[in-house]
Amino acid sequence: SVRLVKGSHIVTRRLFEHDHAYIFQNPDKRIIFAIPYEHDYTLIGTTDIEYRGDPAQVAITADETQYLCDSINRYFRQKISPADVRWTYSGVRPLLEEEGADNPSAVTRDYSLELDAPAGEAPLLSVFGG
């Protein structure tokens, strides 16, 4: 079966002058990145939260915003708060359900292919996971 996992991102003022990206590992073992974005901004992400709502209505939560700010503040001298967030975006991705994987971050990023090819009809290839 498929499990929906939400990833959210924040965009803040530019936090560093060069064009290199950073990748950090948090104490909870999650990876966070900070990437130069559109010359004047820094793109920070991502969260990894199980999602049970309508994928068309996905949005970042206050807790996710704070998590990303706290994550960056652990590593950068220039501190940020939710008030520094210029905009956000979120998305939902389907991951393969894994027995015993309660934490969305622990779910495999592997994929599965299913081919439905009834005789005399066009085949349908479905890709799950990622």
Give short role names for the model-derived ranges.
Residues S1-I44, I49-G130:
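C-terminal catalytic lobe of FAD-dependent flavoproteins
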